[in-house]
């Protein structure tokens, strides 16, 4: 199978590319960054096309030339970056998504898999949120992702494109996502604890939010892509692995690095964005329809992310 990944050099994309190449797929990466955030021997086998999804001509030409069987559309400006640069966010998240969908239809691509977010739900909705919960986001990032979901459904209804997507909880990984996610603290905590011995949260310790380990996200994307369409009741599915408080995340690190110094100074912009998101996601549909389950809970993902960070420090030059 031949696959194109937009945002394929990013946190999720670089691991997804490696996973697909490992199983024998041919991968084309379209990304403004040519160097992967998570380098692997497998990623070096991907074909790299530098550029952004907001460049319509480039997207149309890249998809037409590559003729992929499927597209994983991951490229986006994230929540924190969206509030700082609304115009670019509109171009990348809205026009970019439309460019990808148009290119897919024009080139006869079979399937597009899209990454959405818990930020699409907003505040004041019944919890835990499920696939039927109304989406009333309070931030621009969430608003653009709702629009992206609905565009995908439109292209499914209008053009027969097999559009599928995942709504992700806050993703835990060794590197904070490029582009300024409001939830970047769930990654920064671990890196700063290992490298600096201290971390200052910009949200409240009582804040609760669904989290998910990056490799569980990759497994979800591949699993949803490969799933029998006849078994799918939804176009977009919730993906998360638990709902710890920020204090619980900090405590999990302190248990492993007892001398780490952690404090809390909530940011007046970021903290309200994060607090507007639901504190719990119902992911039962993902399990019931296509068998996805998270392999990592909070304790396991804490162990894994600290292991990867220490391994990185032990191998200079492995990470760029």
Regions picked out by a protein language model, each given a short descriptive name:
Residues 98-140:
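Conserved Rossmann-fold NAD(P)-dependent oxidoreductase catalytic core, especially the SDR/UDP-sugar
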Residues 116-117, 149-175:
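Conserved beta-loop-beta element that borders a ligand/cofactor-binding pocket
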Residues 53-92:
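NAD(P)H-binding glycine-rich loop region in Rossmannoid oxidoreductase-like domains
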Residues 122, 139-140, 164-183:
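Flexible, glycine-rich beta-alpha linker
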